[in-house]
Structures are given as C-alpha cells and as structure tokens.
C-alpha cells in the first residue's frame, strides 16, 4: 500500500466518523426517533432524556458517558455489560501503558538505523517495499544481530508485565462485582432457588418420572426440597403455540385496519394469502384462535402425561441449598443425575436438556472437528481474496483490469478499502453458523452457547484473519518456496508479519472510525424502523417490535475486539505505531458503547459476569501468540538472546493457571457465602416455579395477569425479542 492510499483511507474514515457523529446529535433530538436512540430507557419506564438535557452541544453524550458510574451500567444494562466495559478499560490500560514506554523509545531506535537503506528486501518491509515512511519506524529498519534489538526484547517483557498486572487487577474487580451483584439483588432471582438435573435414570416400575425425581431429592434434602419441573418434549406443542401467537397478531392487524378504515378486511386462505377462498379476516382469525386454543389445551395434557424427558428443574426453599446442590456429586456414576446450576428461565435451550451425558461428549468432539475443518476450508477463499486484493497480485490474476487499476484515483481507492472490506464481508457470514454448531453440542443455556460461539469465532479470526491474511499477501511469491521447504512455515510467518502491518493499521482504523460511527449514529436501524412503521406496522405491538434494539451481541462483538487485541499485541513491538490505533479503538469503543448500553441495548440474559473467564483466557492466548511471534521474529533477525523470551512464555502459562485456580471457582458456581445473604424481600416460591414453565405449557386462563415479578421479568422481554 502506498503512503497516499494509507492517508486517504485514514482521512476519509475520520471524516465519515465526524459526519456520522454530528448526524447522531441531530437525529437523536428528534421526537420521532426516540425509540431508536433511547429504547432501553423507554422499556424501563424512564424519560428518554433523564439525567441529560436537549442541549445543542454535539459532545454532550460524551460527558454523560464519562460521568456514568459502573452501578449506572449495572442498573440499566446488567452485570454482563459492566463486565464487558471492564474488558474494554483493561485492554485500553494495557495498550496505553505499553505506548507510554514503547513509542518514545522504540521509534527513535528504529528511525535512526539504516537497514532498509543498505538492504531493500521486499520480505522485510511493512508494505511490500513502497511504504518507506513507516518502514523506517518499525523493526524492519533494524539491522540483523544489532545490539538495538535488546530494546525490542525488553519491550516484549514490558508489554507482558503490564498485561499480567492489568489482568490480575481486572479479575479481582470482576469477581467482587459478581459477588456484590448476587448478594444485593433487589429482585428474587428464580435461578438461585433451582438446579438443573440431567441424565435422570429410568424410573422404577409404577412411578412416573416426576414422582421418581421428587422422591430422589426429597430423600437427600428432606427439609428444603420444594418441587420439581420435569422437562417434556415440546416440539409439537411449541408449533401450536407459535401458530396461535401468529393468529393473534394477524387478528390484531385486522382489527386495527377495521378501526382505521371502517371496512372489514378480507384475505385469501391459501398459500401466502395469494390463492384460495376470500374470507372476512376478523372472523377467520377468531375461528383459528379458538381452534388453536382447543388444540393447545389438549396437547398440554398429552405432553405432561406422556412426554416427560430425562431432565428436570428442581426447586428448593432457600438459595444456600440450591447452591450447595449444584456443586455436589449426587451419584457415583458420572453419567447419572448430573446436576448444575439452573440458568435463567429465558436462557434455557429446552431441546438440548434431554441429550445424554456421553452423547454430549461425542457431540462436542464432532463439533470441534467440524470447526477445525471449517477453519481450514474457509482459509482458502480468505487467503485467495486477500492475495488478489493486493493490486500487484490483482493485476497478475486479472490482467484485463490493468488499464483501470492504473488510473491514480481508482488505484488509491482500491488500495485504501478493497482488502479490508473483502475481509469484513467474509467474516460477516460466520456467526449464525457457529451459533448453530455451539447449540448442537447440547449446551443447556443461551449464555453458555454465546460463550462457546465467541470462542470458536475468536480462534477462527486469529487463524484465518491474522495468520491467513499475513501469509496470503505473499502467497503467490512464496508458495513455491513453501512447497520445496515445508519446514520454513514459521520463518515465512515471521518474515511476512512486518509487511502486513499497514494492512492491519488500515483495518483497525476502518473498524473504529466507520464501525463505531455507524454504531453511534444507528443509521441502518433508524431507516429500517421508519420503513417498517410506515409500510408494515399496523398495531402498537408491531411498532414496539420494530424498534426493539436487542443486546450487545457478545457472540460477535467480543471476538471482533479480540481480533483487534491480537493484531495490536503482535505488532506492538514490530510496528509500535499500531498501539496508537489500538488505544483509539478501545477508547472510542468504551465511550460509544457506554452510551449505547445506557440508552439503547437491552440485555437478553444475565449471567453475572460468567463471560469474564472466557475473555481472560483469550487475552492470555493473544499474549502467548505475541510472545511466540516475537521469539520467531527476533530469531529471523539472528538475535541469539531471543532465547530469553522462553521463560516469559512459561510465565504466561503459569499466570493463567494461577488465575484459574484462584478465581474461576467463583464463576463456575455461586459461593455459599454469597448465597447465604438474606434477601430484601421474601421469595414467592410459586412464582419462582412458574417462571420456568415454557410459554406453550402456561395456562391461558384469566388469572394469568396476577403473576408479576419473576414472570414479568423473564417472559415479557422474551416474548418481544422472540417475536
């Protein structure tokens, strides 16, 4: 990439961000856009501008985000969101502290050497030999075996020590935050009074599954056992319930149309309403609702009597017993009576609960194999696209484009954006597929599935994006050498890293300027909302569904941040300027997403920080990769003292082990000292029980309105997000 292309990419991205920020300031003040920019506050019954004012200052939202406290985030968006901001601030601190030392020391050391002047090797530059302005500020300009390399080795130690310090501090903080939130919750949390039991053996003759479960736990916990809810096969009844809810929506639309026009609407009864007999919509859907209610009630009786599965949710009268039971071994055989903490009612993946113990293990390894195969096969198109999107390779692969590419303006635009956009498009195709694979493992809860998906996406990103793109840029020119000497892979990776630096600099800049600009302005959700409201929505419920914002999407957001983290780590010493981009990315991310968490996004679940051990492990994995990369690159530079990085690699492994042993237990289970704290309100155990009843098995009788608390918390929002 030429220097002009880099400046064009950086400048246009910055201009786009500024335009989107001012657009956000203008659009967010318009009353008609309030549901798009303040849905979190609306759903909580707050005034959209509570705690702020309708000032014309375009930077007022920045002050609000900075002055908000962690407890404000917990109150409005949950503990998981607060933990995500601990992640953002921790990484920001790592890069800021690293930059304070690395920028003023490494840049002058690199700039005053002359390796690139004496030997202009194409494999030892940050931009294929054309970007000399930045080459001179990187390790590429350091002469092999030079004593200056001591500074770069010391920088690896500095970055590592800063990371250890910040991660230890963050782990302690998150552990305390989780415990405090569980102890001081103002609401009764149904999951704290329940456990999830799987792999239930066949009941003795003459006993039902429910009687068997009740007798088993009543014998073990005679004073605190309350009751059980046996999991049932609900696929058929769920279909009936979904049809019923669909008919109710269509009836509401028909009634709204009748109220607006005084003409009774009609529709055809055939395929997609395009063929068949034309009928009165109100009468037709009323009839279908009555028929579906009758079917639902009949199917409920059948399901409860005949379709009980080998899993159950067991309830206790106090939290301590539930926490103790979740940590205890109930059967000598590991594949019988498997007990874990119960997830939130809205989190349960009901169809996975019946999957047997050994089946879950087999599924897990099969999924791991499928993910590995997917990574390998996905690397082919990513490597190919990354290779041909460098202009030199693009002209080789598609010679007829040469006259177009030679035009200066087009060349600059293509070099600025083509490779990065191609990469972003390829990555956008993955999340749903990886979520499907994660759920196929037999995972019981939504939050656990999201953590599993995030882990897969992280390794996919590192292997395909970081390593794949790094090698792909020199794929055509080094493929023959790799065939002749397969053992030269590590050397090829190490020598390819510097010349991919400018690609990743541009990629990070595109992500934080354009990505966060679109996030703040919410242009796309705004357009979709107004189009739906104008042309599709007929009822208030449909309008509410149109602006419902969803959550922060941790399954994709955390791995995307981890990719930037990995890139910044691995280039922090090779090309220290990337630290500036890393600081801007996580600084802007903290600021903009803080605003979104306080005003926009609504959490779809609450795991009280269980994402943190996953985040901590991936940060350490990125640090470990950074240390390996620097060991390899110092070796390429023929610096014999690179061997001094070997102890650092083992220190990282030991640090990870110590953190897991000290902190992880408090995230895997609820500590008894936390569970024993007295609640502010007395729990209604019947409400706790009913919170776990699936929608399709809930009664449709007139007394449903009395169940608030747990039922309203877990079912109302779930109904909106599922619609």
UniProtKB/Swiss-Prot annotation:
Protein's name according to its UniProt entry: CSC1-like protein ERD4
Principal location: plastid
Family the UniProt entry places it in: Belongs to the CSC1 (TC 1.A.17) family.
One Gene Ontology cellular component: chloroplast membrane
Record's function text: Acts as an osmosensitive calcium-permeable cation channel.
Localization: Plastid, Chloroplast membrane
Source species: Brassica juncea
Membrane topology: Multi-pass membrane protein
UniProtKB keywords: Calcium, Chloroplast, Ion channel, Ion transport, Membrane, Plastid, Transmembrane, Transmembrane helix, Transport
